[in-house]
């Protein structure tokens, strides 16, 4: 469901799938071929969320921002192309670059940045303002770099995202859900 908030309507690219029960609120931009799965909440009420092409946000994930205030520009949430966000994650006011896999039940906090071609392992907690280099395997609570990813692991990241493009295409073929904004 697309929900307009304070004059901002979510912007949805071509061939995007938003599953039943998902809520996309306010200043959200969803790139072409992306998918937002069942019971996700993307709430861009007082800052923006931008999601790139071929990115999948899996079931029960929450994506939010840090509010803009008079003396604080806050943090938007920016997610790149070919990103897979696993089930039941919390992605809060951070940046995730291209070709990243965030494992199930992970949390990424305000001001953190995951550089391209990286994996955040299931259940990891990336704390505020933490920055990780490209090609990192990131695990733990608090999360830390365990090692650099192999080329085979990096290649898998794009395959994972492409699998979800195919899954969402199958759902789009059979789905009777309307994607019209709610005013």
Question: Which residue stretches match the model-derived regions?
Answer:
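Terminal amphipathic alpha-helical/low-complexity segments used for targeting or macromolecular assembly
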Residues: 1-15, 130-136, 141-183
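Structural signal for interior beta-strand "rungs" in well-ordered beta-sheet cores
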Residues: 4-133, 137-138, 143-145
């Amino acid at each position: 469901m697309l929900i307009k908030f304070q004059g901002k309507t979510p912007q949805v690219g071509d061939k995007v799938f938003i599953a039943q029960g998902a809520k996309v609120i306010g200043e959200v931009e969803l790139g072409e071929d992306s998918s937002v799965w069942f019971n996700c909440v993307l709430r861009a009420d007082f800052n923006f969320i931008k999601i790139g092409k071929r990115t999948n946000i899996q079931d029960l994930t929450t994506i939010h921002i840090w509010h803009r205030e008079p003396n604080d520009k806050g943090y938007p949430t920016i997610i790149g192309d070919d990103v897979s966000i696993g089930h039941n994650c919390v992605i809060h006011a951070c940046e995730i670059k291209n070709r990243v896999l965030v494992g199930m039940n992970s949390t990424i906090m305000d001001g953190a940045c995951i550089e391209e071609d990286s994996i955040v392992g299931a259940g990891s907690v990336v704390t505020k303002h933490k920055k990780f280099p490209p090609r990192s395997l990131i695990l733990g609570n608090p999360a830390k770099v365990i090692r650099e990813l192999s080329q085979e692991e990096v290649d898998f990241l794009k395959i994972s995202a492409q699998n979800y493009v195919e899954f969402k295409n199958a759902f789009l073929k059979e789905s009777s859900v309307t994607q019209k904004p709610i005013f």
